[in-house]
Every structure is written in C-alpha cells, then in structure tokens.
Amino acid sequence: MRTLPIFLISLFLLPLVLNAQSVDEMLQKVSAAIEAGQNGQAVSYFRQTIALNIDRTEMYYWTNVDKNSEISSKLATELALAYKKNRNYDKAYLFYKELLQKAPNNVDCLEACAEMQVCRGQEKDALRMYEKILQLEADNLAANIFLGNYYYLTAEQEKKKLETDYKKLSSPTKMQYARYRDGLSKLFTTRYEKARNSLQKVILRFPSTEAQKTLDKILRIEKEVNR
C-alpha cells in the first residue's frame, strides 16, 4: 500500500529534479561560453536560464560573474528586464542601479532607474534622476513628461492650500492679501513655470492633447497671478 504514495511523490518531484538539472546545465553553458569569449552565446544561454529559474540565475550572477567584465553589464540588463516584466520593481531597480554605478551619466540607465523608482513609489528620488537626465539631455521625452506633470500637480496642491488658508480669513488685511498674492507669484515661478518649460518640450516632440490642456491651464493661472 505504501508503494503507490511513494510512486506519486516521485512523479511530483521528478519535474523539479529535471528543472534543477536543466538550470545547472544551462549555467554551465553560460560559464563555458564566457570562458570561450562567446559573449553573445553566453547572453542567449543566460536568458534561457532566467526563463527556467530566475532566482538561481540571479545567484549565479552574484557569485560567478566578474563584475568588472564587459559581459556583466549585459547579464545585469537581462535580469533587470526580466524582473521588470515580472513587475518585481524592487529587483529590477537593484539591477538597473548596478548598471548605473558603472555609468553614472548614462541617460538610458538613469531613465530606467527613474522609471523603477516611480513604480516603487519613490517619486522624490525619481525627480532627482529625471532632473539629472535633463542636465545631460535637455529634450529627453520621458524626463520632460514626468517633470512637467510632477511640477504641475505639486503646484496645484500648493495653490489649493494657499487659497484655502486665505479663504479662512474672515476679514483679511492688506498685508495678508499682499502675502497671499506674493505666495501665488512665487509658486508660479518655482513650480508652474518649470512645468510649462517641460511640457512645451513634450509637445514639440509629439502632439499631446493632455499636455496642451495643461499648458492652457497654466496660461490662465499666469493671467490670474499677474492681474
């Protein structure tokens, strides 16, 4: 009677054993290709191994790959792309950051890191990265889209707070009114103006209806502030 359960258990474990063997075999092929200087073939094997077991493949990267070698960046890119596809943004960010450390001014790496930080809810860090991207590439589309929307939305929040606080005053004095108007003026130059600069660059690259609507709103706010 015990033979049948043991047989069933062995059937269940067999795919796991075969998978482990397949992963080991593929990783051996990766190592052999790297040693032979066949980087393209190594990347192809590595990609196949990721599909079999991404955790084992990641462990191989950390323990077996020379981080100063040319191929290490290519393998890190494969892991980053795979984790991004799986929506594991923490791991994807880890590998994009690994790439960024090797090339701090690489716009593609910065853009990928910034995107992952947005997905991870780290908007402040993404803001810093996108601002650095614009220092390197002023017309970068992704950076201008993010910054245009970020500055506009934060400006709207601050404007609403200014207006709410002012409306709480039952009989505002001239000094309080002047302070309110000065707050609006500073908000426009520090936030709305930055949003406009970025969104104008966006619509130069492609006709965005939403970006144009936001620019129209900013123009109305500018007239309100300067009246």
What residues fall within each predicted segment?
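TPR alpha-solenoid repeat register
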Residues: 58-60, 75, 109, 143, ...
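Short coil/turn linking the two alpha-helices of tandem helical-hairpin repeats
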Residues: 57, 119-121, 148, 153-162, ...
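Conserved structural position within tetratricopeptide repeats
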Residues: 51, 98-101, 132-135, 197, ...
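Canonical tetratricopeptide repeat
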Residues: 62-64, 78, 112, 146, ...
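N-terminal leader/linker segments that initiate helical-solenoid repeat arrays
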Residues: 18-62, 69-74
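Short coil turns that delineate tetratricopeptide repeat
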Residues: 54, 70, 104, 138-139, ...
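Short coil/linker segments at helix-helix boundaries
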Residues: 58-70, 153-198
